[in-house]
Amino acid sequence: MAKDVSRRSVIAALAAAVPISGARAADAVRLGMLRTLSPAPFYMARERGYFRDAGLDVTFRFFESAQPIAAAAVSNDIDIGVTALTGGFFNLAEKGILKVIGGGLHEEKGYQGSAILVSNQAFDAGLTSVDKLGGHSFAITQYGSSFDYLIGRLAAKAGFDLKSVQLRAVQQVPNMVAAVSSGQVDATIAIASQARPLAAAGQAHIIGWIGDLVPYQLTALFTTERMIQRNEAVVHRFCDAYRRGVADYRQAFLRRDAKGEPVVDATTDAAIANITVYVFTGDPKAREKILGGAGFYDKDAALDVADVKEQLRAFKARDLVKGDADPDSLIDTRFMPVR
């Protein structure tokens, strides 16, 4: 009798340790990105439980510039990343390691996402429009970065001599902005939430907006071929949750009234509360900065495939990407819609 009781006790204990049918531990996903306003839909998706609903435990890993995010994916320090596409990224993608799988922030005409920011000294000396950038110093993070790419696009658009621009690689985005506000460098590119406060404080000048001059796919979602091969279903679930975040972001920040002005209401304020968990935390001007800096995301975070291919072509033309892989082999459209 005692043996039967003992056996029943053991069986009951083991049964209690077994998860209820259908329940399972959440799949861990490490997402690499910059700690800026740009990845706001991911902040919202996490705060609103969309990743949890998809059976995912998403951890954010923050970086100071774009190229290290791609490197972190290669070294298996992150599973998925959202970043600007750089020469370094494309060089890794051409080796079959990385795949672009979805869209992110898109520079779009009429939406002020990234500004051309000029120091007071340079502005006072005559650098008052984009076509006058030739002969001036320009801060970027690294050679082959998205900023390096963009100065080339601006030169082609505005007609100044790219070779006359003195590029200063300062490694990190905050250093770029600081270099201009302190007058150490004449100009740079800064997202609106960084550029507007400096201009309002009289510490720098905005002479143009990237979206109005050269609309392009500013950031994109990517993962590794290894992640796709081993966890394709996880990537699909991640993208589904991300799309929910993008839908909420568009509803909060991209609606326009009959006059074309942004609609700001309780939906917007709820989104701001989610975002300030990660950026502008405790900043009394957080609401103002977020409203002034919210950029454009396509519906469902659709990827601008044609522009990604154009970025690759431009990097190759400047010998910043060495391979000759088919551009279509770098992009996997199974996970997100295309523009």
Residue spans of the language-model regions?
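Periplasmic-binding protein-like
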Residues: 106-115, 200-227, 231, 239, ...
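Long, low-complexity C-terminal extensions of enzymes
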Residues: 320-339
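N-terminal secretory signal peptides and thylakoid transit peptides that target proteins
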Residues: 1-17
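Secondary-structure end/capping motifs
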Residues: 229-320
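Short, glycine-/small- and polar/acidic-enriched structural segments
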Residues: 25-160, 166-170, 186-192, 207-209, ...
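Short helix-loop capping/hinge motifs at secondary-structure junctions, enriched
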Residues: 121-129, 226-235
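Short, hydrophobic alpha-helical packing/hinge segments within bilobed ligand-binding/sensory domains
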Residues: 68-70, 87-88, 175-179, 194-195, ...
